[in-house]
Amino acid sequence: MLNWQVIVQLVFLALIITTGPVIIVYLSTRERNLL
């Protein structure tokens, strides 16, 4: 049986992996629009 801390860490890693590229693209497009 998995510990709840392990589950929280797995969910946190999954969120970082899925939202990482989106945040990078968002920041790059925002900087490009500011220029």
Swiss-Prot record:
Coiled coil: none annotated. The chain crosses the membrane at residues 6-26. It comes from the Eukaryota. It is a single-pass membrane protein. It is found in: Plastid, Chloroplast thylakoid membrane. Pfam families: PSII_Ycf12 (PF05969). InterPro entries: PSII_Ycf12_core-subunit. Its main location: plastid. One of its GO terms (biological process) is photosynthesis. One of its GO terms (cellular component) is photosystem II. Keywords: Chloroplast, Membrane, Photosynthesis, Photosystem II, Plastid, Thylakoid, Transmembrane, Transmembrane helix. Belongs to the Psb30/Ycf12 family. PSII is composed of 1 copy each of membrane proteins PsbA, PsbB, PsbC, PsbD, PsbE, PsbF, PsbH, PsbI, PsbJ, PsbK, PsbL, PsbM, PsbT, PsbY, PsbZ, Psb30/Ycf12, peripheral proteins of the oxygen-evolving complex and a large number of cofactors. It forms dimeric complexes. A core subunit of photosystem II (PSII), probably helps stabilize the reaction center. This is Photosystem II reaction center protein Psb30. It comes from Cyanidium caldarium.
